[in-house]
Swiss-Prot record:
Name this polypeptide is given: Probable transporter MCH1
Family statement drawn from the similarity comment of this UniProt entry: Belongs to the major facilitator superfamily.
Keyword field: Glycoprotein, Membrane, Transmembrane, Transmembrane helix, Transport, Vacuole
Membrane topology: Multi-pass membrane protein
Bilayer-spanning residue ranges: 32-52, 68-88, 95-115, 127-147, 158-178, 193-213, 266-286, 309-328, 339-359, 368-388, 398-418, 448-468
A GO term from the CC aspect: fungal-type vacuole membrane
Record-linked Gene3D superfamilies: MFS general substrate transporter like domains
Amino acid sequence: MRLSNIEHWLTYHIRTWLSNSFEWSTIHNSTFIISLFSSISAGLFSMISVYAVPWELRLGYSSLDVNLLYAAGNLGAYLTPPLLGILSDSHGPVILSWLSFIGFVPSYLYLSCVFQLGSDPCFALSVVAFAIVGIATSSLYFCALITCAKLYPDTKLLSISFPTTCFGLSSVIGLQVIKLPWFHSKEDGYLDLAVVFKSFAVFYTFVFLLTWISTSTISIIKLRGSQSPSASHASARADAIVLEDETTLLLASGNKGEFYKRIRNFFQDYIAYAFLIVMLLSMGVMEMFNTNMVNLTSLILGPGSSFNVLTQFALFSTSSRLLSGLFIDLFTKWNWPRIPLIILMLLSAILAQVIIIHAMNVVNISYIAIASAISGFTYGGLFTIFPALTLNLWGDEVFGTAYGTFMLGPAFGSSFFGVMYAQVHDSNCKSVIPAATADPVTSSPNCIVPAFTASTIALVVALTITIIATVKSKRLRSA
């Protein structure tokens, strides 16, 4: 496979250095390790909820301001993957590495300066900065995911499950790191976002240097004409690749035609649209639960209740990513279809919604804990199984475009179900503080039941679409 002009010039010097300095096995293994580290780094955006209190205390942000920043980041992260996928398929994951660097560093430096000033001179610029951070997050995560998929196209555990698991671990690790005293204001005690964001800018510069190296390896793989470097793992050197006449290494028109033919076939495949709808419904519901977990817990158990359900959600999500990848590989080895895993996850999600509705009539944290664990298990599993099936059905050559398109589902789904939850909550539920010393008075948790009734129906529809598509498509039954 040939390289585009952009990919050629962005990777030429790195390819030359790697080929002249290291054995192929060293390059291959190091690239995989760097990609996993990149996945962990990309997930730091999910810690955005801990910024709310410092913003409110120092910058005077209202709840609406904070939610606008959240929305900007999420839209940037979820709406751009189709374009990022096309860029990666056309010019290699190295282009995503550069985009992440260009997005992360200036944005975090600006946000750091705003927090240090103690006032926001232009809130619109902060919104734009967070939208760019969201885009950079998707760029870095896709960069890592696509690199792993190119390195190990034959094993979903290594190509999909490992990077998605690392992405899930990110918030768990990051939350522990920012507990260090260095990240907190000595005078006021709250999280000093000026220090946090500056640290992020420095950290992502270091990550960029590593990913620039790892993504250049994918260019070497293309030039070797092998989609599976493990097949030639014993190859001593890659010197000959770089010594070829560079005029023969640019993307040929024939290869372009074949690539765009694959893209057209994907967009004409009804299975792709079924996947998109299922992801919109299922991931939208899961994002709604994840976003409003603290609010829901307070509504059911009362103000001041334990929020350990957040940790349970994260841990079960991370575990599910790893287990799902393991089961996908086992199913592949045994020649079993993998679509039942999607059906299992959707059934689990429906069960979680039913438990939540039941918990609203029983003031017992056990039900919320169980629902949180099941939802986390489903959330992590779906985010692992969907890309694995995408890779299996449409191949690694258009994987970025295909899975990037599917990410539109969570983008619109999370917005729709999140707004629905907010509307039901604001219309039916009350939370007032009659006096400064009084405890908040909340209405019955049953007030939010309509939101979860609707989410349960949405999951049933997603399950029905999945079953119908499986029955109609022999290719999907054997996927």
